[in-house]
């Protein structure tokens, strides 16, 4: 292990060892994590142990093979990653639909049987497809699978990503496009995964857009901008205000922290701070 990776890993292990009584979060929001917030060197088991000790409720973007590890620590597998395609190849191209319909319907059954509330999906990249045609194709696909999702009580969440910095050519890169798709599908189980980091880069106006389009949002992700690092004052977003705005809308879903610690930082301390910011 390199020295620069060893110290944060050591801090995480120490924090986990010292926390014998789990923190009970008293705020209105249910918070989750992704693997990246723990840095590069922590095992899934250790990250679950630490997350549970800090009052985290769930773990995003984890597949079925690892669900038992999450559940061992009382964590909900909050967002199933994989069956809904990939960022570049997903719902906006009809040639993907047959395979994705099969995998999505199977995943809905699997999620329902295992207490997993949501499945992530994507628009896909534009390539040669125009935005209007891509939206039509996404609507057509989601209309095929929504009844099964509704019957099983599983959310299908399409992620809103930026095409300016991280995901060049991604189609769902403005909130208006995604809201149009959601309105046309019009299902209580088909929603937007509103990634606040990506939204800030593309449209900004975070709180107004969340309030205006709240009925179409099923999950949130966080990350500091610029850089997708910790949520402190080294970045531009006022996450405490954003958290309060979300809670004031009586949001009952999950907020997932999805950032990577800056070099030399203590990931445990940064996660503690993120959880406290959203404990409103």
Give the positions of each predicted feature:
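Histidine-acidic metal/acid-base catalytic patches
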Residues: 2-32, 37, 41-52, 116-117, ...
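Active-site acidic/histidine proton-transfer and metal-coordination neighborhood
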Residues: 10, 16, 23-25, 90-191, ...
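Short acidic, glycine/proline-enriched helix-loop-strand junctions
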Residues: 68-80, 154
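Active-site-proximal loop/turn and secondary-structure-junction residues that shape catalytic pockets
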Residues: 37-39, 63-65, 83-85, 125-127, ...
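Anion (oxyanion) recognition and catalysis
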Residues: 52, 71, 112, 150, ...
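Catalytic domains of carbohydrate-active enzymes, especially glycoside hydrolases
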Residues: 47-66
